């Protein structure tokens, strides 16, 4: 059986697709997977390194652009549609899964025209424009968060969770324990592959407020390239035990080692930290489409499965206050992690592959 996975652009779209690909290939050694994305997306750098086949098409967004740019994007969409039809004819997939991102639309639309079974996966609480449009053409819509159900056809929508890569699943800890009162606490701070300048700034501004507990903290801080030197210098001058790195290659190990986490609230990040059962302070990226990161974090706050500081309220003092609150009440670290873990859906990739192959089996009867 052949599966084509369309979309990407960011890790939030791509990583769930990789997780589904891993599960699909594990089912049968004769199964094949082809990814379709764009040359500008993270997929162009990552997928060849992971050994996956990738075809690139021309595609770009329309929302929020000038009238002239919209005309150009519409022309690219038509060209991308033609490219998608060629790829579909050559690869002849049994199933097409759109995971969001610019490349998803022309491929799923082309698959509809060629009567190939097509599905979409939505990672966020507030769906992107692409998936809202494609939902009407999909056999099934897989959602990660219950809050997004209202945007899609009820009879075609299935809550699966956000698929996780095997490297994350294999390192999921058995549980979060309450740290002892004299135990050192490991704080992980990260802001995505390029880092997050605002989080970096707030963290170093928090150090004077955290001075009284610095002997209890061991910090791992992923900054991105730009801020690394300045952040490392500030930790050293302030006397904090900190590992400062531009990138974290092994996120599974980083999650496993952490007691507390400060991070953004992208869908993949939330899926990973809930699977690992970690107490997180979420700082949603305020410019994400439709403010979906805030809504992602709020879904956890409702279940007492995390904490949130909006970026407009973020300061060194506010961040330090939240960290100090967890240090002062270590039982909250365990309970918040347990609540987060209860929301994790570790079998998301399995459920998605099950549903797609079931639809295909119905077609063949």
Curated annotation (Swiss-Prot):
Keywords: Cell cycle, Cell division, Cell inner membrane, Cell membrane, Cell shape, Cell wall biogenesis/degradation, Glycosyltransferase, Membrane, Peptidoglycan synthesis, Transferase
One annotated GO biological process: peptidoglycan biosynthetic process
Catalytic activity as recorded in UniProt: di-trans,octa-cis-undecaprenyl diphospho-N-acetyl-alpha-D-muramoyl-L-alanyl-D-glutamyl-meso-2,6-diaminopimeloyl-D-alanyl-D-alanine + UDP-N-acetyl-alpha-D-glucosamine = di-trans,octa-cis-undecaprenyl diphospho-[N-acetyl-alpha-D-glucosaminyl-(1->4)]-N-acetyl-alpha-D-muramoyl-L-alanyl-D-glutamyl-meso-2,6-diaminopimeloyl-D-alanyl-D-alanine + UDP + H(+)
GO cellular component labels: plasma membrane
Topological type in the membrane: Peripheral membrane protein
Subcellular location: Cell inner membrane
Binding site for UDP-N-acetyl-alpha-D-glucosamine: 10-12, 124, 165, 193, 248, 293
Enzyme Commission number(s): 2.4.1.227
GO function terms (MF aspect): UDP-N-acetyl-D-glucosamine:N-acetylmuramoyl-L-alanyl-D-glutamyl-meso-2,6-diaminopimelyl-D-alanyl-D-alanine-diphosphoundecaprenol 4-beta-N-acetylglucosaminlytransferase activity; undecaprenyldiphospho-muramoylpentapeptide beta-N-acetylglucosaminyltransferase activity
Transcription found in the keyword field: no
Pathway(s) of this molecule: Cell wall biogenesis; peptidoglycan biosynthesis
SUPFAM superfamilies: UDP-Glycosyltransferase/glycogen phosphorylase
Membrane spanning residue stretches: none
InterPro entries (UniProt xref): GlcNAc_MurG, Glyco_trans_28_C, GlycoTrans_28_N
Keyword Cell wall biogenesis/degradation on entry: yes
Enzyme class, first EC level, given as a word: transferase
Pfam families given in the database record: Glyco_tran_28_C, Glyco_transf_28
Family recorded in the similarity comment: Belongs to the glycosyltransferase 28 family. MurG subfamily.
NCBIfam families listed in its UniProt record: murG
PANTHER family: GLYCOSYLTRANSFERASE, UDP-N-ACETYLGLUCOSAMINE--N-ACETYLMURAMYL-(PENTAPEPTIDE) PYROPHOSPHORYL-UNDECAPRENOL N-ACETYLGLUCOSAMINE TRANSFERASE 1
Cited function: Cell wall formation. Catalyzes the transfer of a GlcNAc subunit on undecaprenyl-pyrophosphoryl-MurNAc-pentapeptide (lipid intermediate I) to form undecaprenyl-pyrophosphoryl-MurNAc-(pentapeptide)GlcNAc (lipid intermediate II).
UniProt protein name: UDP-N-acetylglucosamine--N-acetylmuramyl-(pentapeptide) pyrophosphoryl-undecaprenol N-acetylglucosamine transferase
